[in-house]
């Protein structure tokens, strides 16, 4: 049985590397990404226990310097699915802080990897991590479909009497 740190170092890092991610390059993969968690702007006092920092086990970055996905890691003896909500919260808080969509989350115990496109599909078990290029392409397709949908809705609204 491995602890989470060993699982990350001995299994998850290797699986990311086999998909082409340079786990030693922080412009591609950052471990322990510090995510600020704050209250909504209209809430000024008192300071809440819900404010502070979260640390995503991994953030996978695109060429533009923004995260494409977060990865929540669990030790090998734990069910990877217990990281689902935690990973979603990380993605949601990154999105709030950056103002950019962050729909892709992964959670894994090193052996089982789950992928969740939080905007389009339910979580599903996958065999490995995608390449950086593949993930960036999927994100562009998602963004393109959203822009197309928004444009269509605006045109429909403008055409109504």
Which residues are covered by each model-predicted region?
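ATP-dependent helicase/translocase motor core
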Residues: 1-161
